[in-house]
């Protein structure tokens, strides 16, 4: 994306909607400018960063302060016209230079602490997700050079109060907000507009000659395809939560093979016939797991443990401990069955495959060998 693509509005029903940027972008920009201020020993009032999606942001700096080898800076969160609980709050970074050559990243006041497994971060760590961790560390490294070290603390004085308006406590993230964002940009869109933009990408892929498509919920799926399957990500299209819609669009466009790739936290819902996977539509993850574990003869003790879990990742640990990892192949086959049932009136339905992977990019299960699927995708 170019810089202009951030400034360009998103149109919905004749109304121009303004884009925003994530808490991850705020933390990255704050850390970068704080590091630069320590090095230069003067205040800086504007900073630019390149987001993971390639968009350049030029952001105003608030509350800049330098004291010796330490500097503090803040960026105000702007969600554009997609206002959430963090909109308008200040995200601060405190950067202290040292001679260690290493960059350490911690969360301070107002940043949540991970107290449960299942969110992809270690217990006890700050709720700063993987992509923002990478962008913060990269921005600071770019600023200070290869030899110096730095201690980076991200904090948000309003964080604990704001977090009460989020789902963090339900996820076991306590005491503050999460620093999140895989693209760095907040795009305000109605559901229909968002679906249409995803479908447009499918149309572009089909027009380029592709006949096989990989549908993923988001960026993690694309990374898995690239790193673990060795398949050209040109075949990957994001489906977000709109599984049924995107499958129907792929059929309409004449794709001969659809491969669903994702973490069980999303794809397991399809096994229950849920084709819109946003939590406000339906959840049933634990109920689906319990039902299919029971079909495979799992003991009542395991069924009870899984039923009591709040996250799929937590349930997966119990499943592994009881030796029921084969459920993922079973679920993948069930997902494909549900898709084919949905397409039962289609004249020439495509081949459907499903692959489930873990947060650390390991294959959990598939409806048939992944090597076979990958080989077909490379044809």
From Swiss-Prot:
Its UniProt pathway annotation is: Cofactor biosynthesis; adenosylcobalamin biosynthesis; cob(II)yrinate a,c-diamide from sirohydrochlorin (anaerobic route): step 6/10
Keyword S-adenosyl-L-methionine attached: yes
| Enzymatic class | transferase
What are the alphabetically sorted keywords of the record? Cobalamin biosynthesis, Methyltransferase, S-adenosyl-L-methionine, Transferase
Q: Mind telling me which Gene3D superfamilies this protein's record contains?
A: CbiD-like (3.30.2110.10)
| InterPro entries reported in the protein's UniProt record | CbiD (IPR002748), CbiD_sf (IPR036074)
Which GO biological process entries does UniProt record here?
Answer: anaerobic cobalamin biosynthetic process; methylation
NCBIfam families per the record?
Answer: cbiD
Organism in which the protein naturally occurs: Salmonella schwarzengrund (strain CVM19633)
- The entry's protein name is Cobalt-precorrin-5B C(1)-methyltransferase
UniProt gene name: cbiD
């Amino acid at each position: 994306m170019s810089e202009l693509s951030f400034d360009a509005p998103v149109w919905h029903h004749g109304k121009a909607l303004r884009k925003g940027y994530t808490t991850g972008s705020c933390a990255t920009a704050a850390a970068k400018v704080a590091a630069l201020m320590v090095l230069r020993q003067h205040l800086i009032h504007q900073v630019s960063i390149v987001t993971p999606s390639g968009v350049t942001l030029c952001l105003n700096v608030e509350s800049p302060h330098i004291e010796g080898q330490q500097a503090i800076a803040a960026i105000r969160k702007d969600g554009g016209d997609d206002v959430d609980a963090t909109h308008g709050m200040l995200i601060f970074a405190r950067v202290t230079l040292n001679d260690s050559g290493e960059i350490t990243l911690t969360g301070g006041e107002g940043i949540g602490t991970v107290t449960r497994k299942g969110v992809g971060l270690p217990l006890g760590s700050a709720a700063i997700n993987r992509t923002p961790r990478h962008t913060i560390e990269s921005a600071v490294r770019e600023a200070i050079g290869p030899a110096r070290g730095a201690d980076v603390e991200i904090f948000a004085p309003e964080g604990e109060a704001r977090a009460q308006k989020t789902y963090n406590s339900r996820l076991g993230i306590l005491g503050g907000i999460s620093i999140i964002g895989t693209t760095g940009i907040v795009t305000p869109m109605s559901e229909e507009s968002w679906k249409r933009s995803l479908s447009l990408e499918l149309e572009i892929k089909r027009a380029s000659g592709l006949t096989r498509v990989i549908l993923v919920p988001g960026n993690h799926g694309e990374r898995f395809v690239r790193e673990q399957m060795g398949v050209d990500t040109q075949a990957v299209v994001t489906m977000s939560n709109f599984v049924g819609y995107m499958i129907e669009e792929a059929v309409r466009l004449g794709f001969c093979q659809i491969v669903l790739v994702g973490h069980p936290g999303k794809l397991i819902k399809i096994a229950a016939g849920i084709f819109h996977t946003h939590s406000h539509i339906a959840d049933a993850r634990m109920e689906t797991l319990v039902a299919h574990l029971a079909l495979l003869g799992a003991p009542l003790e395991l069924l009870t443990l899984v039923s009591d879990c709040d996250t799929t990742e937590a349930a997966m640990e119990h499943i592994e401990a009881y030796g029921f990892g084969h459920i993922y192949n079973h679920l993948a086959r069930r997902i494909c069955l549900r898709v084919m049932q949905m397409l039962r009136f289609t004249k020439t339905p495509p081949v459907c495959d499903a692959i489930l992977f873990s947060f650390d990019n390991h294959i959990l299960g598939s409806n048939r060998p992944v090597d076979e699927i990958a080989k077909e995708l490379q044809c």
